[in-house]
Amino acid sequence: MEIFITGDTHGDFRRFRPDIFYEQEHMTKEDLVLVCGDFGGIWHGDPRDDAGLDWLEDRPYTTAFVLGNHENYDAYKDYPKEEWHGGQIQRIRPSVLHLMRGQVYELNGRKFFTMVGASSHDIQDGILEPGDPDFEEKFQQLEQRGALFRVNHRSWWAEELPSEAEYLEARANLERVHWNVDYIISHCCPSSIQNVFSGGIFKKDALTEFFDEVRQKCTFRYWFFGHYHSNMVIEKKYAMLFEQIIRLK
């Protein structure tokens, strides 16, 4: 099994074209490409998403992804869950898989811990409620100002951060493997690692603090994450990915 990892796609899958990602020539459905959040392939939750998902299904490999903050969480609620390599997934297409929050998967003899989500940093000017009687007026005013805002259940979802039950499930699954995995796949990263490259621009939250707990308690080889739209290695074992596609050895 070959495993490749990349960063945010936001529904734009051009990096996986055969003339760009040429390694796929020798890949099969047993091989994986993992996306570290902000997958964006299910944004509308209706047939408008089908072209991109069908294109991924036509690739010779299997696409797997965790969710980020720019995702339509409502659109995932109707997909059934199933067990896959020791953890829970949602099968979007036969070979397009959502790797769920707080799961541990065993792939090719290696353990992967996945944790979904991140805080949106483009909501400084607020989150509008579609049911607000003044919604249209407020929306137009914010648009004209070029404000950074989102609309609840249209472009922002509270589920971008885990619930208490999901944190408990994540800890229980890590306990089950004695806090010992090979790789961690997430969208954002621990608060302490965030501080190294951002100088405090990105603020800590419950998820990044949980990741610091994982960092301290868990034995792992590498931690791969997206979210920050750059490619960078921090302290040798934390790999920030955006458009780069790397191969696990």
What are these language model-derived features?
Residues 6, 12-107, 200-212, 216, ...:
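Core catalytic region of metal-dependent phosphoesterases/phosphodiesterases
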Residues 14, 44, 74, 123, ...:
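Generic domain-boundary/flexible-linker signal
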Residues 161-249:
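Internal alpha/beta domain cores that form substrate/cofactor-binding pockets in large enzymes
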Residues 17-18, 48, 78, 119, ...:
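Residue-level detector of alpha-helical segments with a strong bias toward transmembrane helices
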Residues 1-10, 109-118, 185-187, 239-242:
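Active-site-proximal beta-strand elements of phosphoester/diester hydrolases
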Residues 110-201:
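Active-site-proximal loop/helix segment associated with metal-binding centers of metalloenzymes
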